[in-house]
């Protein structure tokens, strides 16, 4: 087993599902803050920030990775979550894309 797999196993054995869900909520909140900060850093808002766009982009990428890691751990920890995630891939994913596009005014060409 490589180091990463050892770390994952250790974390999965150490933390229960509730703790992982709490961690996901925290990381998702930090991701939200990073996305809002990037809006400001790019000058897309009147409320500018002194932080650089590159620095804020790096923070956003880190928060995205943090969320991905916790989501992966949750899918390994809980069979129901894993099943729901794998079941929703593909068919549901297309429906989500379609709904989003339609909300934005997309019309299928006939």
What residues fall within each predicted segment?
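Flexible "arm" and connector segments at domain edges
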Residues: 1-110
């Amino acid at each position: 087993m490589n180091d990463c797999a050892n770390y994952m196993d250790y974390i999965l054995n150490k933390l229960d599902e509730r703790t992982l869900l709490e961690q996901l909520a925290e990381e998702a909140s930090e991701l939200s803050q990073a996305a809002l900060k990037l809006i400001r850093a790019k000058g897309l808002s009147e409320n500018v920030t002194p932080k650089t766009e590159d620095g804020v982009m790096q923070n956003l990428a880190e928060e995205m990775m943090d969320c991905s890691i916790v989501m992966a751990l949750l899918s390994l920890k809980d069979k129901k979550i894993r099943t729901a995630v794998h079941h929703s891939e593909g068919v549901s994913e297309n429906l989500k894309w379609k709904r989003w596009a339609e909300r934005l005014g997309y019309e299928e060409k006939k």
